[in-house]
């Protein structure tokens, strides 16, 4: 079975400046994200060993570790695609219509998502997701890398609120970081995720 690998970025580390510094992106990608990838592969190897030995305590421990590190790998893989040096502005098309319908307007959605990000206690993410069962857009505060978002939610847009994502540049002023984030949102990527989520899911079953 193939190992998980660190994805390449579609842009240089410094391409998102001045909104997100090249120093942050380099550390974030080559160190933090890479650590999650290693953690996934290590947890799987330890799970296989624990299963072979019938060690259920070790199985449960490494399943927990796997959830955390795989969550980190998935979240960051989406994060890099959600960003673009040509980003910003607002969504268009069906995604824009869905946001207007379900949040009242883009400005109201942006305010709600921003509040979710700034109000997060500790480490985690703000997430715009598509509820494949109810067929609606929802925002969530995702705790750590894997908690507080129900199964069946397909992530469309995420902002990383772990301190490693902003502290070197914005210190403890999270609000300035989140404000800057909107300038590099890759709405084409978010729209593509929305189109796939709405066309390839039915209830909790992928078509």
Curated annotation (Swiss-Prot):
Coiled coil: none
Phylogenetic classification of the source organism: Bacteria, Bacillati, Actinomycetota, Actinomycetes, Mycobacteriales
Enzyme class: oxidoreductase
Entry similarity comment: Belongs to the iron/manganese superoxide dismutase family.
Alphabetical UniProt keywords: Manganese, Metal-binding, Oxidoreductase, Secreted
This protein's name: Superoxide dismutase [Mn]
Localization per record: Secreted
PANTHER family attached to this UniProt entry: SUPEROXIDE DISMUTASE 2, SUPEROXIDE DISMUTASE [MN], MITOCHONDRIAL
EC assignment: 1.15.1.1
Gene Ontology cellular component annotations, sorted alphabetically: extracellular region
InterPro entries in alphabetical order: Fe/Mn_Superoxide_Dismutase, Mn/Fe_SOD, Mn/Fe_SOD_BS, Mn/Fe_SOD_C, Mn/Fe_SOD_N, Mn/Fe_SOD_N_sf, SOD_C_sf
Extent of the signal sequence: none
Catalytic activity from the UniProt record: 2 superoxide + 2 H(+) = H2O2 + O2
Single GO molecular function: superoxide dismutase activity
Gene3D superfamilies: Fe,Mn superoxide dismutase (SOD) domain, Iron/manganese superoxide dismutase, C-terminal domain
Pfam families in the record: Sod_Fe_C, Sod_Fe_N
Function noted in UniProt: Destroys superoxide anion radicals which are normally produced within the cells and which are toxic to biological systems.
Cofactor: Mn(2+)
Location (main, coarse): secreted
Binding annotation for Mn(2+): 28, 76, 160, 164
Cofactor: record remark: Binds 1 Mn(2+) ion per subunit.
């Amino acid at each position: 079975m193939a190992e998980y690998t660190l994805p390449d970025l579609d842009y240089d580390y410094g391409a998102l400046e001045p909104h997100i510094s090249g120093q942050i992106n380099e550390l974030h990608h080559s160190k933090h994200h890479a650590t999650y990838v290693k953690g996934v592969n290590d947890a799987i190897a330890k799970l296989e060993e624990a299963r072979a030995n019938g060690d259920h305590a070790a199985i449960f421990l490494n399943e927990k570790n796997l959830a955390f590190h795989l969550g980190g790998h998935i979240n960051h893989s989406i994060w890099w695609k959600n960003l673009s040096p040509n980003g910003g502005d607002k969504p268009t098309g069906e995604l824009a219509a869905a946001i207007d319908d379900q949040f009242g307007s883009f400005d109201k959605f942006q305010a709600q998502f921003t509040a979710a990000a700034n109000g997060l206690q500790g480490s985690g993410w703000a997430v715009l997701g598509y509820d494949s069962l109810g067929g609606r857009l929802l925002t969530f505060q995702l705790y750590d890398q894997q908690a507080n978002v129900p199964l069946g939610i397909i992530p469309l847009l995420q902002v990383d609120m772990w301190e490693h994502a902003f502290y070197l540049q914005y210190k403890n002023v999270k609000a300035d970081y989140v404000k800057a984030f909107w300038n590099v949102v890759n709405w084409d990527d978010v729209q593509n995720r929305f189109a796939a989520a709405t066309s390839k899911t039915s209830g909790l079953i992928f078509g």
